[in-house]
UniProtKB/Swiss-Prot annotation:
Tissue: Ubiquitous. Expressed in all cells, except in cells undergoing spermatogenesis.
PANTHER family for this protein: LAMIN DM0-RELATED (PTHR45721:SF11)
Encoding gene (name): lmn-1
Descriptive protein name: Lamin-1
Function statement: Major component of the nuclear lamina, a fibrous layer on the nucleoplasmic side of the inner nuclear membrane. Provides a framework for the nuclear envelope and probably also interacts with chromatin. Essential to maintain the shape and integrity of the nucleus, and for DNA replication. Involved in spatial organization of nuclear pore complexes. It is not a target for ced-3 during apoptosis, suggesting that lamin cleavage is not essential for apoptosis in C.elegans.
Annotated ranges, domain LTD: 435-550
Annotated segments matching region Coil 2: 257-385
Species of the source: Caenorhabditis elegans
Top-level taxon: Eukaryota
SUPFAM superfamilies named among the record's database cross-references: Intermediate filament protein, coiled coil region (SSF64593), Lamin A/C globular tail domain (SSF74853)
Segments of this protein annotated with the region Head: 13-47
C-alpha cells in the first residue's frame, strides 16, 4: 500500500532466502562394532526413514493444500482487483460523463446568465434613460392632473355660474330687449362722448398750451406793459368770459357724445373679450385634456414597460439563484458520492491489506514448510549418498520473492543445529544460509515515487505537499535485470496538493486521461531480478528512488523448528 509520511522515507522489506550447506566434521570410528552395530543402525534408519516419509507425505499434502489455498486467494485477489478496477473505471466514466453534463449545463447557464446580464444592463440603461422622462412625464401628469382638477373645478364653477346665469338669463331676456334699445342709444352717446372726449382732450391740450403761451406772453407783457395791461384788462376779461363760455358749451356736448361712444365700445369689447376668452379656454381645456390622455397612456405604457423589465430582471435573478442552488445541490451530491466512493475504496483497501497480510502469513508458512522439506531432503540425500543410491544431489536451492510494494519484514526463523550420525560414526552439522532482500525507498522534496505495481503494470508518482508542484520535464526510469523503460512528463505537467499521477504500461488496458492517468506508447514496465526505479527532475538529478539490496548470512538454526504446524 502507498505511504505518505514525509519528504524522505525509507521502507525495508526483508525476505528469506534458504539454502542448505553441509559442513561435515569427521568423527573417529571403530571397526570393532561389527555386523551387530550395522544391523542396529539400519533398523534405526529404517524406522527413522519410515517416520520421515510419513511426515514428508503429511507435509506434501499440507503444502498442496496451502498451494491450492494460495491459488484460491490469488484468484480472489485478482477478482477483487478486476472488480475494483471495473468499479473505478465505471465510476470514473460516470463521473466524467456527469462532470461533462454539468459543465455543459454550467456553460449554458453561464451563457444565459451573460445574456440576461446584457439584457439586464441594457434594461437598466434604458430604465435610467427613461427614468428622467418618466419623472418629467409624471411631473407633467401631476401638473396636468392639477390643471385638470383646476379646470374641472373651474368647469364646475362655470356650470354653476352657467346655471345661475341661465336663470338670470331668462330673467334678463326681457331686460335685454329694453337694454338693447338703451344700448343702441347709449352706444351712440358713447361714440359721441368718445369723440367729444378726444376733441376735448385735444382742445384742452391746445388750450393749455395756448394758456401757457398766453400766460408767458402775459407775464412778459405784464412785465413790459403794466400800464397797457391795466388799460385793456377790462376788455380782455370780457373777451375771456365770452370765449370760456363758448368752450364750455362745446366741451359739454362733445363729452356727452364721447361718453356714450366709450360705453358702447367698452360693452362691445367686453362681449368680444368674453367670447374670445371662452373660446380660448375651451380650446386650451380640450388641448390639456388631449395632452392629459396622451400623458396618461404614455405613463401607463412606460409603467408597464418598467414592470416588464423589473419582472424580467427578477425572473433572471430567480433563474440564476435556482441554477446556483441546483449547482450547489449537484456539488454536494457528487461530493457525497465521492466520499462514499472513497469510503468504499478505503474499505476495499483495508480488505486487500487484510488479505495481503493473510497471504504473507501463508507465504511465511509456505517458506517454513519449504525449509522443513529442504531439511528432510538433505537427510534423505545423506542416506541415499551413504547407501550409494545416488551420485549427486543439488546443494543449494533458493526461492526469490521480491516485491516493490511489500510493506513489512519477514524475520529469520531457526532453532538448534541438527546432527546426523552415519553408520561410519561420522556426524554432519547442517548450517542454513539466509538470504535477505532490502527494499530502500528515498525521496528528496515534495514529489516522489509513491508505489510500483508488482506485476509491472503501473508506477505512481505523488505530491505529498500542501502546494501545487510542477513536474514538467521529470523522467521516470524503471530497471529490472537487463531491461529498462522510461517515461518523461510534458513541460506543463503540474500536480495538485496531495494528488498523484499514474503511468501505465502500453498493454495494461488503461485509458489515457491526463493529468491523472498516462499510458506509455509501445513500452511496458520491466519485471525481473534486481528491480529499481528512480524519478529524475528536468536537470537530470534524482529526486526519488527505489532500490533492492541482497545480503546473505549463515545460521545453524533450522527455520522449520519454529513452524507453528510442527
Amino acid at each position: 500500500m502507498s505511504s505518505r509520511k514525509g519528504t524522505r522515507s525509507s521502507r525495508i522489506v526483508t525476505l528469506e532466502r534458504s539454502a542448505n550447506s553441509s559442513l561435515s566434521n569427521n568423527g573417529g570410528g571403530d571397526d570393532s562394532f561389527g555386523s551387530t552395530l550395522l544391523e542396529t543402525s539400519r533398523l534405526q534408519e529404517k524406522d527413522h526413514l519410515t517416520s520421515l516419509n510419513s511426515r514428508l507425505a503429511t507435509y506434501i499434502d499440507k503444502v498442496r493444500q496451502l498451494e491450492q489455498e494460495n491459488n484460491r486467494l490469488q484468484v480472489q485477489i485478482r477478482d477483487i482487483e478486476v472488480v475494483e478496477k471495473k468499479e473505478k473505471s465505471n465510476l470514473a466514466d460516470r463521473f466524467e460523463a456527469e462532470k461533462a453534463r454539468l459543465r455543459r449545463a454550467l456553460d449554458s447557464a453561464q451563457d444565459e446568465l451573460a445574456k440576461y446580464r446584457i439584457e439586464y444592463d441594457a434594461a437598466k440603461v434604458e430604465v435610467k434613460k427613461l427614468k428622467p422622462q418618466v419623472e418629467k412625464l409624471e411631473r407633467e401628469l401631476a401638473g396636468a392632473e392639477e390643471q385638470a382638477l383646476h379646470a374641472q373645478s373651474i368647469a364646475d364653477q362655470s356650470q354653476a355660474k352657467q346655471k345661475t346665469l341661465q336663470a338670470r338669463n331668462d330673467k334678463l331676456v326681457v331686460e335685454n330687449d329694453d337694454l338693447k334699445k338703451q344700448n343702441i342709444t347709449l352706444r351712440d352717446t358713447v361714440e359721441g362722448l368718445k369723440k367729444a372726449v378726444e376733441d376735448e382732450t385735444l382742445l384742452r391740450t391746445a388750450a393749455n398750451n395756448k394758456i401757457k403761451a398766453l400766460e408767458e406772453d402775459l407775464a412778459f407783457a405784464l412785465q413790459q406793459h403794466k400800464g397797457e395791461l391795466e388799460e385793456v384788462r377790462h376788455k380782455r376779461q370780457v373777451d375771456m368770459t365770452t370765449y370760456a363760455k363758448q368752450i364750455n358749451d362745446e366741451y359739454q356736448s362733445k363729452l356727452q357724445d364721447q361718453i356714450e361712444e366709450m360705453r358702447a365700445q367698452f360693452k362691445n369689447n367686453l362681449h368680444q373679450n368674453k367670447t374670445a376668452f371662452e373660446d380660448a379656454y375651451k380650446n386650451k381645456l380640450n388641448a390639456a385634456r388631449e395632452r392629459q390622455e396622451e400623458a396618461v397612456s404614455e405613463a401607463i405604457h412606460l409603467r408597464a414597460r418598467v414592470r416588464d423589465l423589473e419582472t424580467s430582471s427578477s425572473g433572471n435573478a430567480s433563474l440564476i439563484e435556482r441554477l446556483r442552488s441546483e449547482l450547489d445541490t449537484l456539488k454536494r451530491s457528487f461530493q457525497e458520492k465521492l466520499d462514499d466512493k472513497d469510503a468504499r475504496i478505503a474499505e476495499l483497501n483495508q480488505e486487500i491489506e487484510r488479505m495481503m497480510s493473510e497471504f504473507h502469513d501463508l507465504l511465511d508458512v509456505k517458506i517454513q514448510l519449504d525449509a522443513e522439506l529442504k531439511t528432510y531432503q538433505a537427510l534423505l540425500e545423506g542416506e541415499e549418498e551413504r547407501l550409494n543410491l545416488t551420485q549427486e544431489a543439488p546443494q543449494n536451492t533458493s526461492v526469490h520473492h521480491v516485491s516493490f510494494s511489500s510493506g513489512g519484514a519477514s524475520a529469520q526463523r531457526g532453532v538448534k543445529r541438527r546432527r546426523v550420525v552415519d553408520v561410519n560414526g561420522e556426524d554432519q552439522d547442517i548450517d542454513y544460509l539466509n538470504r535477505r532482500s532490502k527494499l530502500n525507498k528515498e525521496t528528496v522534496g515534495p514529489v516522489g515515487i509513491d508505489e510500483v505495481d508488482e506485476e509491472g503494470k503501473w508506477v505512481r508518482v505523488a505530491n505529498n505537499s500542501e502546494e501545487e508542484q510542477s513536474i514538467g520535464g521529470y523522467k521516470l526510469v524503471v530497471k529490472a535485470g537487463n531491461k529498462e523503460a522510461s517515461f518523461q512528463f510534458s513541460s506543463r505537467m503540474k500536480l495538485a496538493p496531495h494528488a498523484s499521477a499514474t503511468v501505465w504500461s502500453a498493454d495494461a488496458g488503461a485509458v489515457h486521461h491526463p493529468p491523472e492517468v498516462y499510458v506509455m506508447k509501445k513500452q511496458q514496465w520491466p519485471i525481473g531480478d534486481n528491480p529499481s526505479a528512480r524519478l529524475e527532475d528536468s536537470e537530470g538529478d534524482t529526486v526519488s528512488s527505489i532500490t533492492v539490496e541482497f545480503s546473505e548470512s549463515s545460521d545453524p538454526s533450522d527455520p522449520a523448528d519454529r513452524c507453528s504446524i510442527m
